[in-house]
Amino acid sequence: MELEIADPAFRDRLSAPAYHVRQHNGCSYWNARLVRRDVPARYVGATHEYLSVDGPAERLDAIAFADHACGSSRKEKVERDLALLSAALAANPADARSMFYLAQTLRDAGRHAEARDGYAKRIEAGGWDEEVWYAMLMHARSCLALGDAVGFVDGCLSAYEFRPTRAEPLADLARYYRERGQNETAMLWVEAGRRIPYPEGDALFVDEGVYRHAFLAEAGIAGYYCKSPERRRAAHEATLELQLRRDVPDAVRGLARRNGMFYAPSADALFGAATRVPLALPMDEPYAPMNPSVMLDGDDLVAVIRGVNYRLGDPERSWPRLPAIRTRNHLARLERDGTAREAREIVPAPSIPPAAPSLVVGFEDLRLFRWRGRLHACATVRDRNPAMRCEIALLALDDDARIVELALLHGYRDDLHQKNWMPAVDGDELMFVYLCDPTIVLRYDPAARRVAVHREHAPALALDHLRGGSQLVRFDHGWLALTHEVAMIDEANRRYLHRFVFFDRDFRVSAITEPFRFADEPIEFAAGLAYDATRDAVLASYGVQDCRAMMATIDAAAVRRALVALPGSAGRPETARA
């Protein structure tokens, strides 16, 4: 048991004879915990004792107890409680509380038929309406455990009729019908349950998850299969909400993120028709283009296009058949239709130290930018240390696409594999957004050739699944970037989705779009972004299936409209400019 103190000054305001305090472990209930010394009180019950107070008691919201269920072993407790409660009922057969907890203990022991009968006896005994209602709900659940579907449905309906201010029976019905593929019926119970507010006045066994997230989670699954566009839209919105809620369990949030791949719109559906062009360069076999990074260099459109020697899904051209995974990069100046005016392979100048022997060779997924008058890129590299650990390399390029300076960016979490840092050129400073939740901004010190934490922010929503994608580019009053997230279909298959993320001037996440997809194929990765203010257009470059390099031109006004402000933030660009 852990005491949680929301208001440390609560002691100064204690004046009532006694106080009820909330205890919770996903299920919430209130019982007397603080009693003045002169107030008569006694413990009641053979087990699951509670403190009975003579006289009035108030609720104390300033503290609570988190129950981590760390008491005696479950088996020993069940056996002990069965003996104590059976003895109590033998002495007093009308003891309604002992009836209730005997049924509860039989349920915990997996003796569902006896539990069902025990709950029926407690219902018949009457008395405290909350305990009677809970016995009705548990009687229904015991029927379901015994395969009695009719008894379960009837029991849930009876429990709801008895206490329509409690939504737990409707959550059970929604799950029951959804698990049986009756999704339209499930949505009826979802819609009814969502209209029931949290029962603030109830003291016994309030399932907090039902009122916080259960109906949203059920809607996100069942609504996908409904015929009604309104229900499908509500299901999509429920899934988007759960993906970002901090106050739901990790498993619920994770399920919503996985389910998000089924709802994710195409970029065209979200932003209007985008112009797509391939960024194709002639590459020697066996290399194929992927994961380009575009930027606007003045009026010039410039891109780094990565070429790789492996092929997804081809065992003969994948690890471990290949002796090494190799990357070659080309710097290209492009027309707006994606054709290259000129292209040169990026190679180290003779002054750059040679790479170490490695099974993964070359600079991966460059992000291109201009800093201090020179083209630069940051990349992941594995062939600069004997352990083949992923490191971030900062590359300075000359006009002939030669790497004339190389710095490995150490100084923050050097013990981890590092990938996908997002560069931002802020005047004379070079920053990197390392994570979105918390938003960690690293500053590069060119004299020391190291990075250090410059800023750290905690966004209002859960954004821990957003991973680095493009550069950060100036956009309206802040910065715009593309991030990616991965939905795992199973252990071997995954789906990539992207979001536009808007940062304020101080690199706080201010607004995000919903996740979307550039392509209809599962593997896509955006590493480049540019904002063309003259045309008010966003240029996004991305790879598809690790074998195609693409660029999309998107209406910037549509991006602004799709960005949704985070609570407490400066807002989306359109709002801030108005």
Predicted feature locations:
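Catalytic-site signature of metal-activated, phosphate-bearing donor transferases
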Residues: 2-117, 127
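Short coil turns that delineate tetratricopeptide repeat
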Residues: 93, 127-130, 164, 198, ...
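"A position-specific structural signal for the A-helix of alpha-solenoid helical repeats
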Residues: 101, 138, 172-175, 179, ...
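Residue at a conserved register position within TPR or TPR-like alpha-solenoid repeats
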Residues: 106, 143, 177, 222-223, ...
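Beta-rich carbohydrate-recognition and catalytic domains
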Residues: 265-287, 296-358, 370-464, 474-522, ...
